[in-house]
Amino acid sequence: GNCKCDDEGPYVRTAPLTGYVDLGYCNEGWEKCASYYSPIAECCRKKK
């Protein structure tokens, strides 16, 4: 969606406090989001 996985913390690739790099799917309770600093990347974030 339009959510940003790492807009509330450090960059997900270097300090995954708000998300993790997506490997094709998101774990249960997580949502797929765009990376705030890397528009072409996707990652997963815990649903709020």
Swiss-Prot record:
Gene3D superfamilies: Anthopleurin-A (2.20.20.10). Delta-SHTX-Hcr1f (RTX-VI) may be the result of post-translational modification of delta-SHTX-Hcr1a (RTX-III), which would consist of Arg-13 cleavage. InterPro entries: Anenome_toxin, Myo_ane_neurotoxin_sf. GO terms for cellular component: extracellular region; nematocyst. GO terms for molecular function: sodium channel regulator activity; toxin activity. Disulfide bonds join C3-C43, C5-C33, C26-C44. The modification Lysine amide is found at K48. Keywords: Amidation, Disulfide bond, Ion channel impairing toxin, Nematocyst, Neurotoxin, Secreted, Toxin, Voltage-gated sodium channel impairing toxin. It is found in: Secreted; Nematocyst. GO terms for biological process: regulation of signal transduction. Belongs to the sea anemone sodium channel inhibitory toxin family. Type II subfamily. A synonymy between H.magnifica and R.crispa is controversial. This is Delta-stichotoxin-Hcr1a. It comes from Radianthus crispa. The lineage of its organism: Eukaryota, Metazoa, Cnidaria, Anthozoa, Hexacorallia.
